[in-house]
Design a protein with these regions (language model features):
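First exposed extracellular module after export/assembly in secreted or surface-exposed proteins
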Residues: 4, 36-243
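Bacterial Sec-dependent N-terminal signal peptides
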Residues: 1-48
C-alpha cells in the first residue's frame, strides 16, 4: 500500500507514532480537576522523525527500567520498536488483534538536558495482558498508552466517523475511565497499536483520506475536546491508497 504525503520514514522503520502516558501537562492541556471527568487525556506530543518528544522526565513513566538508564527531558529522542506474536489472535471490531511480546525503547538525550553530554541506550518496556488492534502492516502503526492511578481503571476506545462536509474519515481515540477497564500497576503505561491501513479495509475506495483525532479533555460544559494530529509537514489529512 502506498502512503502519500504522510511522513518521512527514513529514520523509523517500526511504529511511527508513539504516545505514552498522562501527566505531560506541557503537551496535553487539561484542567486540574480532570480526574472528575469520565474521559482522561492520554497523549503527548511526538515527532515522526525520532519517535516521541517527552515533556517531562521519562522516569515518571516506567519506574526503575528508565530511571536506571537515564533521565530524559524535553527534546530527547525516543524510538520504540516491538515484536508481534502472530499466534495470539482474537476477533475484534478492528478486524484483527495481535499480542505484542515486548517493546524496546531506544533513546538519545540532548546535550545539557541531563547536565552533561548526550547519551544513548535502550531498555525493555514491560508489557502484560495487552492487545494490538488492527490488521498490522510492517511499518504503519499508531502506538499509544496511558498511565493511570493505581486505584482506577481505564480502557481505550477508538471510533470511526466521517466528516459530512469533506468526506474525510476520522479515527477518534479516547481514554475512558470506569470499573471495567484495566487497572494500572504502579506507574506503568500500556502501549497499543493500530494500522492506518485499516481505513482502506473500511472503505471500497482505492484512495482514502482521513484524520486522527485524540481526546485531550473536556470543557467546562462537559463537551469532549479533541486535537487533530498534524504531521511534521503540517498536514492534518493523511492519504493512503491501494497498490
Amino acid at each position: 500500500m502506498k502512503i502519500l504525503n504522510v511522513l518521512n520514514m527514513k529514520r523509523i522503520v517500526f511504529p511511527f507514532l508513539v504516545m505514552l502516558m498522562l501527566g505531560m501537562s506541557g503537551c496535553v492541556k487539561h484542567s486540574d480537576n480532570v480526574q472528575n471527568y469520565p474521559y482522561i487525556p492520554a497523549f503527548v506530543d511526538f515527532s515522526f522523525e525520532y519517535g516521541i518528544i517527552l515533556n517531562t522526565a521519562i522516569g515518571s513513566i516506567v519506574s526503575s527500567e528508565i530511571q536506571n538508564a537515564t533521565d530524559l527531558w524535553t527534546g530527547d529522542a525516543v524510538l520504540v520498536t516491538f515484536t508481534v506474536n502472530y499466534d495470539q489472535q482474537a476477533s475484534t471490531e478492528y478486524l484483527i488483534a495481535y499480542g505484542v511480546d515486548y517493546v524496546k525503547v531506544g533513546y538519545t538525550t540532548a546535550e545539557g538536558t541531563t547536565g552533561g553530554e548526550s547519551t544513548s541506550g535502550s531498555f525493555d518496556f514491560p508489557i502484560e495482558d495487552m492487545n494490538v488492534f488492527g490488521l498490522l502492516d510492517k511499518t504503519l502503526f499508531l502506538i499509544f498508552g496511558h498511565k493511570a492511578p493505581e486505584d482506577q481503571n481505564f480502557y481505550y476506545e477508538m471510533t470511526f466517523d466521517r466528516d459530512v462536509t469533506t468526506g474525510t474519515q476520522m479515527l477518534k481515540i479516547r481514554a475512558r475511565k470506569n470499573g471495567e477497564g484495566t487497572k494500572a500497576e504502579k506507574n506503568i503505561g500500556y502501549p497499543y497499536a493500530f494500522s492506518i491501513n485499516n481505513f482502506l479495509y473500511h472503505s471500497s475506495e482505492n484512495t482514502v483520506e482521513f484524520t486522527i483525532q485524540y481526546m485531550t479533555g473536556v470543557d467546562e460544559d462537559g463537551n469532549e475536546e479533541f486535537k487533530t494530529f498534524v504531521d511534521e509537514s503540517g498536514n492534518s489529512v493523511i492519504k493512503i491508497s491501494r497498490e
